[in-house]
Amino acid sequence: KNNLKIEARTDKNNKRYYFIRIAEPIQAKKISFGIGRDYSGLRVITVSEISFYNYDSLEDDIMGLYEDELHTVLKGSVTEQTIQDLRNRLQTKDEASGEYHPDKDRLEKELDNAEDILNNQLSEPILVHNTITTRDTDRGFSGLNAWQPLGITAAAGEEITLFVGHNTMGTGSNTNLQLVATQYHAESGSVSKVVTTLKTGRNDVTIPKIWSTDEESGGALYIQYTGNNANDRYSVRVNGGVEVPTLDLYGVTDAQERQQRAEQYVEALKGYVEKMEAVHKKVHENSGNESVEYEYSKENCILGATDILLDKMLFSLPAQQVLSGCEGNAQKLLDSMDAMEGMMNLFYQHKGLNQTAPDEKDRFPQRHLNIRYQRMFA
């Protein structure tokens, strides 16, 4: 039983059938099918046709293009010719049956996904934390969200492409991930918008304009997990926008790893902030996108958006101010973050919450308090 995967499918005539996949090729003289029915006896299952297919390594070869099980990173040896050779095999009918591969449509999507990844300049994969979710229990206070930074800032009207991978779902499947667009240096009523619910594989998205203020429009992008499954493993890569340094310390308890991540982040910030005005002139002033065709302003340029993700807090701040505040010192930054986490512990304990409480509503929230760089009320 553990070596079988049974999928209920529907053909082009809306007739249901079942696709049975055996984990590994077998040699057999006899195969037995046991077909039952429910206890009511009203629904009789009948079988009009059974098709058997010879083993073909094509599916394994296509899945073998990827470095990771989430299908967002290709192996270094993959070329356009590698993908084309597999596509040619997929377009060839089986000699014995005279039919194409029974999973031809799904495998074509996998090849399209691999080709897209190969031909695009993508950001590094972001692994989604499945313990930060919108399905968190309501505890009677607001100000929390389930946003996870993608390390990308994008202008309103800009078209970007996101590639989503999952540990079990095939390309084109619906996910529990939403893309959230935000406005940098926003007013209180125009901070964010859920743009779309993503599918596995390629997602082409246009970033919406969130406000009408005569300043640059756009900001940091986030993923929001809406599920509640500990086995969900998602990875996201982005083509488009501008990569911005971010620091993810969520769930990181090892002191050495925290130090290393903080040092890498601060070094990345130094190089990024130094070049920010030049990048603005290149990708904003000369972009042809009126949403960002403004003279450089360090207060309003959306390139300034950086995020620091902690266990209970998400900081969304100007990159220049983070660098200035820590004076380019990773240890000073870590000390500040540790102090904030300690304050959040006291804050939640004051509300009667306890991380080890038996009832979820009495535990610390899974969502984050988000401190953002925003405009003061007029």
Residue ranges: model-predicted function:
Residues 57-119:
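Beta-rich interaction/scaffold domains
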Residues 282-378:
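Catalytic cores of extracellular degradative/oxidative enzymes
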Residues 19, 32, 161-163, 222, ...:
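Beta-strand secondary-structure signal
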Residues 116-258:
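Beta-strand-enriched, solvent-exposed domains that form extended recognition/catalytic surfaces
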Residues 2-22, 190-208:
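Extracellular carbohydrate recognition and processing domains
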Residues 16, 27-29, 41-48, 158, ...:
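Residues that flank catalytic or metal-binding motifs in active/ligand-binding sites
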Residues 1-2, 12-57:
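Aromatic, loop-rich ligand-recognition surfaces of beta-strand-rich domains
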Residues 40-58, 227-298, 303:
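Exposed low-complexity, polar/acidic, P/S/T/G-rich flexible segments that act as propeptides
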